[in-house]
């Protein structure tokens, strides 16, 4: 009887990354996606540890779909690929900033960004007036 080779280890996030993440009750972290050279905010997606690992190691962004309960790699169907330039964790560990080179539309509606045309009415502040407040 011949020996079977040991199964390949299941890849995981580096411990220092996994330990720093503060996940929601579903094990997910918000991922803000930004165009690397213009700083344009493109979209918000969700990642679990495996989606983040895939994003950090493949050069392409992978999200976890909350509605479909499955992984999806941006651009596999549409061709609108997000090429990873950097990933950063915020100070609280509960959000990621994924800087990308976006090919085509980022939004499933076909627009460049998911934040087109739905601005809300606000009272705009003035940073110059902050020193005048009493």
UniProtKB/Swiss-Prot annotation:
Q: In which pathway does it act?
A: Amino-acid biosynthesis; L-histidine biosynthesis; L-histidine from 5-phospho-alpha-D-ribose 1-diphosphate: step 3/9
Q: Which domain of life is it from?
A: Bacteria
Gene Ontology molecular function: any one: phosphoribosyl-AMP cyclohydrolase activity
Taking the record's annotation, the residue ranges forming a coiled coil are none
What cofactor is this protein dependent on? Mg(2+); Zn(2+)
According to UniProt, the reaction catalysed is:
1-(5-phospho-beta-D-ribosyl)-5'-AMP + H2O = 1-(5-phospho-beta-D-ribosyl)-5-[(5-phospho-beta-D-ribosylamino)methylideneamino]imidazole-4-carboxamide
What does the record say about how the cofactor binds? Binds 1 Mg(2+) ion per subunit.
Q: What is its EC number?
A: 3.5.4.19
Keywords attached to this Swiss-Prot or TrEMBL record, sorted alphabetically, are: Amino-acid biosynthesis, Cytoplasm, Histidine biosynthesis, Hydrolase, Magnesium, Metal-binding, Zinc
Q: What's the short name of a Pfam family annotated to this entry?
A: PRA-CH
Q: What Gene Ontology terms for biological process does this UniProt record contain?
A: L-histidine biosynthetic process
Where is Zn(2+) bound in this sequence? 91, 107, 114
Q: Does this entry carry the keyword Metal-binding?
A: yes
InterPro entries in the record, alphabetically?
Answer: PRA-CH, PRib_AMP_CycHydrolase_dom, PRib_AMP_CycHydrolase_sf
Where is this protein primarily located?
cytoplasm
Q: Where do the annotations place Mg(2+) binding?
A: 90, 92, 94
Q: Name one GO cellular component term.
A: cytoplasm
Record localization: Cytoplasm
Subunit arrangement?
Homodimer.
Per the record, the similarity remark reads:
Belongs to the PRA-CH family.
Described function: Catalyzes the hydrolysis of the adenine ring of phosphoribosyl-AMP.
- Name the NCBIfam families on file: PRK00051.1
What is the name attached to this protein's record? Phosphoribosyl-AMP cyclohydrolase
Question: Could you tell me which species this protein originates from?
Answer: Arthrobacter sp. (strain FB24)
Q: What is the lineage of its organism?
A: Bacteria, Bacillati, Actinomycetota, Actinomycetes, Micrococcales
